[in-house]
Swiss-Prot record:
Entry keyword annotation includes Zinc: no
UniProt GO BP: chaperone-mediated protein complex assembly; protein folding
GO CC term, one of those recorded: prefoldin complex
Subunit architecture: Heterohexamer of two alpha and four beta subunits.
Function, as annotated: Molecular chaperone capable of stabilizing a range of proteins. Seems to fulfill an ATP-independent, HSP70-like function in archaeal de novo protein folding.
Organism for this UniProt entry: Saccharolobus solfataricus (strain ATCC 35092 / DSM 1617 / JCM 11322 / P2)
Protein name: Prefoldin subunit beta
One Pfam short name: Prefoldin_2
């Protein structure tokens, strides 16, 4: 395929690449959130075995600050709830982006088959 692609195919390929980049960024953010959720769950699990009057320290910036178990658990549960909401939102966005990519891939392959009917091997894969 040494010849230049038609402008409409180039435009669709550019759109495809933008969607792919958007999906990659979304997956990276989703992974970061999932890692933080795992960490919060581990901390909450450890806190659950401590006595209510146990001495707890949390990191605030560059400082270790003494805190009570109840407030730390509340803070962690609030953060966990927020992250779970974000995770569900990202899952929905991921599903939408994957569908858009799939549809656009089919459209591009269809366009390419019209321009290069005997090519057989032309087309893109996600």
């Amino acid at each position: 395929m040494a010849e230049k692609l038609p402008p409409e195919v180039q435009a669709q390929l550019a759109k495809f690449q933008q969607l792919k980049d958007q999906l990659d960024r979304l997956l990276l953010e989703k992974s970061t959130i999932e890692n933080e959720l795992r960490e919060i769950n581990k901390v909450l699990e450890e806190l659950s075995v401590l006595n209510a009057d146990a001495t707890i320290y949390k990191i605030v910036g560059n400082l270790l600050v003494k805190s009570d178990k109840t407030s730390v658990e509340k803070e962690l549960n609030d953060r966990k709830e927020l992250l779970e909401l974000r995770s569900r939102t990202y899952q929905k966005q991921e599903s939408i982006l994957r569908k858009q990519l799939e549809d656009l891939q089919a459209k591009i392959n269809d366009m390419l088959s019209k321009y290069y009917p005997q090519g057989g091997q032309t087309g893109i894969k996600a």
